[in-house]
Amino acid sequence: VSDYIKDIKFKLYEFKDVVIEPFKHILFNPISEDNYRFASHSYSKYKDILSNYSVDSPDTIKTKYDDVFMIQTSPNCFHMMVESLPRLWAYHTNKDENILINKNILDRFEGLFDILNQYLNFKNIQFSNYEVSKERITKHRFYVKTLKMFASTNSDVKKAVDDVKKLSVAFWQKYMQENFMPVTPFRKIFINRSIKGELQKRLRCGNQDEIFEKLKKKDFELLDPNEVNLKTAMKMCYEAKEIVGVHGAGLTNILFSQPGIKFTQLTYKNKQEDIYKNIANIMKLNYNVSYGLKKDKDIYATEEELFYIKGDL
């Protein structure tokens, strides 16, 4: 595990008067003037958010652009597992902290509560639903007195992002080693992208069912992240010797696989590929990619249309 965090430096930051916006962002008022980057993305992406932000107490948070740091806290699996949780709860640092958690996040990812219970003292945890009404809490915002968090001390935003990913990989690899019995990988897994309900409009691969039918003949199993709890998905990926998956939040499950396995991403030919390619490279997976084509033409599909994977994988 130490190999993943070699040559990178982190500092444990303590914040006071933290406002948490569930499903959006955590905004921080640092107690230190150190200009370390808490970047999971560049500051410029959030200018509009910061300029429109207001809270009940002017002392709660600075609205000056350069003084505010943030981290994604979306219930999207990638943002939670890579950009948020390991930075908040790595190495058992927050057992005595008071923190308020949106219960909807735990409900959405069955099994996550048990994982967090190893790193947090739940006697100090307050749970809340999406609608909140409390003193010093505005609608949909949670107020926390203190919070500790790891941040990269790299002043370069891109390198800080890489540092965060290395820390996250190390965190989850350590978790898997401590909580799952050693096993020689044997499964072949296909991770689909959910097309149920409102997510139907976000379908990317137009022939994923057809792809899986072909892969079944090669002994692949289906992993639908919306149909199994988190620990089941973890176990399946930990036992996998090969993973094929459609680009989307479900591919975050490669974090739980063992280094060196084969991983093939099905995606558009654009920068989206880099999200999971970078994780795969950190983990030293045998990375492959198959770019989606237009349905009736052998040219690359654009993000505005469904892509189709043709030929064998």
What spans do the regions from the language model cover?
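The feature primarily captures lumenal catalytic ectodomains
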Residues: 1-313
